[in-house]
Structure formats: structure tokens, C-alpha cells
Regions:
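Gly/Pro-rich turn-and-neighbor structural signature
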Residues: 76-144, 149
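A short core secondary-structure module
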Residues: 146, 150-170
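Short, surface-exposed linear patches
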Residues: 19, 28, 128-132, 163-166
Length: 170
């Protein structure tokens, strides 16, 4: 089960492999959150992923590490986000720290609904069905519409929603 994978991070036989200290977060975190700096860091990450895969016989398609790795990669490239906005770069990095600090399970919602698969999002008979920002105010953004394919949504702590694939271009 998912809980058993998290429990492995506290078991004496697997803790050292599955948990490491993160300078970015300032505490111990699950190995998937580690931003690797050496070949040995990468080797340990691979071994940690393999240990979780072995523990569930490879039968958990969306284990907690799958998006944690992606979030660590985004945090590692904070400079990329800073090219557009220092605030955005800080938000990405602080979100990584929040998720890592709390060892949260994330999933994602990727795709727009398609009423007609031969048409792009803006060409659909009802393009408003697709998730979109309809307002921005002091509290953040206001969304309307839907995204689909959120595989681990029933048991995830956090849901990442992003514009994938590009939906206004051919």
C-alpha cells in the first residue's frame, strides 16, 4: 500500500536509503525530494526508487515519488523561473520546500476535455469547458472549467494542474 511505502522511510533497514538531509529544506526529506549534486546522489536516488518498486512488486503506478522528483527538478532550476519573474521563482521554490517538508503525495491533472478530438481547445464547440483563468485578484486566481486524467487524485495530498499539452497551437 502507499502507507507501507511511507512507513519504509522510518524502518531501520531502509531509512538511510529512503531519507536524506536537504540543504534547501533544512531538514530530512524523502530521497525523491533530494536535488542531486553528485553521481553518488543519483545512484542513491535510483536505489531508493528501486526499493519502493520492489516493495510493491512494481504494482503502484503512481507512487509518492513520481511527482516529487519533478518538483525537485523545478526547484533545482529556480533560475529558469527567475528569468520571467523573481516572485514566480520564489513561489516554485517555496512550494517545493512546503511539499518536501510535509512529505506530501502529489498527482497531476494534465489534459483538457475534448468534445471533438480533431480540434484544438479554442476550436471546440464549448471552449469554456476547458480549465482557464477567469479572474485574478488579491487572493490569487479564479479558475473555471475542468482538466482530466488525475490518476492518483483519490489518495493524493496535492494536485498540480498545468497547461499540457499546448492547446492553442498546431
Amino acid at each position: 500500500s502507499i502507507a507501507e511505502l511511507y512507513d519504509m522511510q522510518h524502518e531501520p533497514d531502509t531509512r538511510e536509503l529512503l531519507v536524506c538531509h536537504s540543504e534547501e529544506v533544512g531538514q530530512e526529506v524523502g530521497r525523491a525530494f533530494q536535488i542531486p549534486r553528485t553521481a553518488d546522489d543519483l545512484r542513491l536516488k535510483r536505489e531508493a526508487y528501486f526499493a519502493w518498486a520492489q516493495a510493491n512488486c512494481g504494482m503502484v503506478g503512481r507512487s509518492p515519488d513520481f511527482l516529487n522528483v519533478m518538483l525537485a527538478a523545478l526547484a533545482a532550476k529556480k533560475s529558469f523561473f527567475a528569468e520571467d519573474s523573481a516572485e514566480r521563482a520564489n513561489n516554485v521554490f517555496e512550494y517545493y520546500r512546503f511539499v518536501a517538508r510535509n512529505d506530501l503525495f502529489m498527482t497531476h491533472a494534465l489534459l483538457d476535455p475534448q468534445l471533438d478530438k480533431g480540434k484544438l481547445r479554442n476550436e471546440q464547440s464549448d471552449p469554456a469547458i476547458c480549465l482557464q483563468v477567469v479572474d485574478e485578484n488579491e487572493n490569487g486566481i479564479v479558475l473555471s472549467g475542468i482538466k482530466r486524467i488525475a490518476t492518483a487524485a483519490p489518495y493524493a495530498d496535492e494536485l498540480l494542474v498545468w497547461p499540457f499539452p499546448p492547446t492553442f497551437q498546431r
